[in-house]
Amino acid sequence: MSFLEITSLSARVGPVPILRNVSLNVAAGEVRALVGESGAGKSMIGKAILGTLPGAIRITGGEIRLDGQNLLALRPAERRRVIGQTAALIPQDPLTALNPVRRIGPQITRRLVDILGWSKRDAEARALDLLAEVHIPDPKRVMQSYPHELSGGMRQRVLIASAFAAEPKLIIADEPTTALDVTVQKQILRLIKEMQERHNTALLFVTHDLGVVAKICQNLTVLFGGKVLEEAAVEAFFAAPQHPYSRALLAATPKYTDPDQNLTPVPQRIIDDLQAELRFAERTTT
């Protein structure tokens, strides 16, 4: 049974569609990638799940179920409680995600104390254990540090520890290595996968990088213009992508085993055809 079930989810900004009848499932313990170029709607799906969509965006239809509960049918306070107990986010930029004027310790323990009702002592002990688990040396010192006193990679490790603090059943990782240099990216990807396997957490990995998908994901969903174009197992996708856009996206991805590869951008014809298809679908449903 899927832990996360999204069915026919649609959203708009005014008259402009942002998500178009999106359906996808993530099973317990599964690692699924959400793939697409900028503006495809990847992050909007994550925000819709977590209830953090910008105020101007309105959900116009569909369901989002976490462990069988339809989040969109819950009152705001109940929805926050359910999400706080079952899901967490690893954000893109650790520097902006962390509060610059608060020490690291309270930023990890706040969720445990405020949402789950843990004692401060138990929450601090849990935070120390998690910082050690994500391979941060001297966790006690880091608990007392401010974000600016840590490197980018250390800050991202803090956010990973924070995401796993309440033992969520679903982690949404929103391009979590974008703000890091290449050598640190590899370490963080390995750490996320290690933590996901150890805690048997479902992972929805938002990315535009198919190389990352190949390293850590089992399945993927390809988006364009807020619409799902293809779903596949990762091995099957890389062997034989089915949708023309998926094939073009794969052809535009550098292969480190072929330094002489000629990269082919996604043909404008495919983009034009997709945009025309989306405009036609919009006219027939309004």
Task: Explain the meaning of each model-derived region.
Residues N70, D122-R141, L250-A251:
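Conserved ABC ATPase "signature" region
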